[in-house]
Amino acid sequence: METQKNLNTYLIHQRRYFHMHPEIGFDTYQTASYIYNELKNLGYSPCYLLNKAAVVAKLNLGKEKTIAFRSDMDALPIQELNTIAYKSTNSYMHACGHDAHMAILLTLAKAIREHLNEINYNITFIFQPAEEGPLPGGSKKIIETHLIDDIDAFFAYHVTNKLTSDSIGIKVGAACAAPDLFDLTITGKGCHASTPHL
């Protein structure tokens, strides 16, 4: 059985690896390859999606219902200025926590392997690229594959510095902001810039 200390060590190792090797958008091939191989090493049979930019692993335990856990994978086009030992090795950065999300999901997959007799659901693990863009984003593309049509409940998560590391915040429905594009037309009379509505 994995001890909590071993799982913590595994989690930290994974997070630091992902932090050092960020990729953006749908160009997450090395990240997906790493996740694919790690899941194979943990005893899963993962498959690639979206031209090998995404990874899904299904654990079919013959249960009536299926739950899914999802992690985003992509980084941002930001140059990291930190001087930490596991600093990004390229011109991108995991500045939004996706490195932690992938590490958490791999650690969950590892822990579940140790507790199969206690699991009451089939489980699907989803590693999704392009959460930060480009549109239409990775989630829509994964949905269009129909590989996740059998899921009864879906769990996603996001790290935050508003909670301590030993806490989990739960909210039904939307919990984080998301960007969107829209057009706005304002019609009015010309006038002084301080009061364009008059």
Residue ranges, per PLM feature:
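Histidine/acidic-residue-rich, glycine-tolerant segments that coordinate divalent metal ions
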Residues: T83-M93, I119-L198
